[in-house]
Amino acid sequence: GCCSDPRCRYRC
C-alpha cells in the first residue's frame, strides 16, 4: 500500500 512507500506515505 501507499503507507509503506516513502514516496507516497505523506498521503496517509
Swiss-Prot record:
* UniProt modified residues of type Cysteine amide: 12
Could you tell me which InterPro entries the record lists for this protein? Conotoxin_a-typ_CS
Choose one Gene Ontology CC annotation of this protein and give it: extracellular region
Coiled-coil ranges (or none) = none
**What domain of life is recorded for the organism?**
Eukaryota
Task: Please describe the organ and tissue distribution of this protein's expression.
Answer: Expressed by the venom duct.
**Which coarse location class applies to the principal site listed for this UniProt protein?**
secreted
Give GO terms: molecular function aspect only.
acetylcholine receptor inhibitor activity; ion channel regulator activity; toxin activity
Task: Give disulfide pairs as residue numbers.
Answer: 2-8, 3-12
Q: Which UniProt keywords apply?
A: Acetylcholine receptor inhibiting toxin, Amidation, Disulfide bond, Hydroxylation, Ion channel impairing toxin, Neurotoxin, Postsynaptic neurotoxin, Secreted, Toxin
- Compartment(s) where it occurs, according to its Swiss-Prot or TrEMBL record: Secreted
Q: Which residues form the signal peptide?
A: none
Question: 4-hydroxyproline (modified residue): where?
Answer: 6
Give the function comment from the record: Alpha-conotoxins act on postsynaptic membranes, they bind to the nicotinic acetylcholine receptors (nAChR) and thus inhibit them.
Notes concerning its domains: The cysteine framework is I (CC-C-C). Alpha4/3 pattern.
Into which family does the record put it?
Belongs to the conotoxin A superfamily.
Q: Can you name this protein?
A: Alpha-conotoxin-like Reg1e
